[in-house]
Amino acid sequence: MSRPRIVFMGTPEFAVSSLAACFELGDVVAVVTQPDKPKGRGNTVTAPPVKELALSRGVPVLQPTKLRTPPFAEELRQYAPDVCVVTAYGRILPKDLLELPTHGCVNVHGSLLPRFRGAAPIQWAIAHGDTETGVSLMVMDEGLDTGPVLAMKRMAIAPDETSASLYPKLAALGGEVLREFLPAYLSGELKPVPQPSEGMVLAPIIEKDQGRLDFTKPAVELERRLRAFTPWPGAFTTLGGKLLKVHRAQARGGSGAPGTVLASGPDGIEVACGEGSLVLLDLQPEGKRVMRAADFLQGHKLAPGSQPFVAG
């Protein structure tokens, strides 16, 4: 076929690489993204990154507050899309929109489906201790990331990987999977394959309180969750009734009652967990900068055997 007419739907920085790929692969006739939102301490109304790229390329931008309305479907129909490419748009598409393009809607998802269906696949892959992840290109249906898969691209998860470091790598991989496989799908050469029934794991949206360190849990689990929830919501505990963020930690094999300080010094603050121990390396007291444990201890005496942290 000649250059396909593409409607792109996406919102955050993660989707920018996919949109850039679409500009190479066809004519992007419209971009659908979430409405501008207040951001930062000043609550400055900010456009989504996808919108900024679209406007720089002179592409019409649609920012509906609701998708399930006939007027929006009709507006989209006027662009006569051959395919809709969706990457991290942030909303579930109704059936009439899924069926509107000639070749339906395809989605770039940040996991190896069916593992980690849902809103936070990058975070949960790290939290589960997976050593491999990737992106999946699938044909969308009405379910939550349940559509048949066209292709996958894989990559290793490093032992010290955080969501912050993995995010741009998978975003770039999303652009690659589109460049490599979207043309073959549109030509009919590549057929989607149903997802296997086994191996499904959900990746629900992250809530702020999930960053709280529960020292009754295994240290390995806490260390993974710290990396998974970096940068948001971060890992935190309380000390003396005040918030204490933990930016870097290491799992060890120490033992003791959960929440007990086993050792404290230049090498960190070792806290007993339900299984093993967690050495706190970089900390941020409430209202202050991030600092090494050694600097933190200059103003806070945490003697071995003390229990300054809430265990659960």
Swiss-Prot record:
GO terms for molecular function: methionyl-tRNA formyltransferase activity. It catalyses: L-methionyl-tRNA(fMet) + (6R)-10-formyltetrahydrofolate = N-formyl-L-methionyl-tRNA(fMet) + (6S)-5,6,7,8-tetrahydrofolate + H(+). (6S)-5,6,7,8-tetrahydrofolate binds at residues 111-114. It holds the Pfam family Formyl_trans_C. Coiled coil: none annotated. PROSITE patterns: GART. Keywords: Protein biosynthesis, Transferase. GO terms for cellular component: cytosol. It is an enzyme of class 2 (transferase). InterPro entries: Fmt, Formyl_trans_C, Formyl_trans_C_sf, Formyl_transf_N, Formyl_transf_N_sf, Formyl_transferase-like_C_sf, GART_AS, Met-tRNA-FMT_C. Its EC number is 2.1.2.9. It comes from the Bacteria. Belongs to the Fmt family. Attaches a formyl group to the free amino group of methionyl-tRNA(fMet). The formyl group appears to play a dual role in the initiator identity of N-formylmethionyl-tRNA by promoting its recognition by IF2 and preventing the misappropriation of this tRNA by the elongation apparatus. HAMAP family: Formyl_trans. This is Methionyl-tRNA formyltransferase. It comes from Myxococcus xanthus (strain DK1622). The lineage of its organism: Bacteria, Pseudomonadati, Myxococcota, Myxococcia, Myxococcales. The gene is fmt.
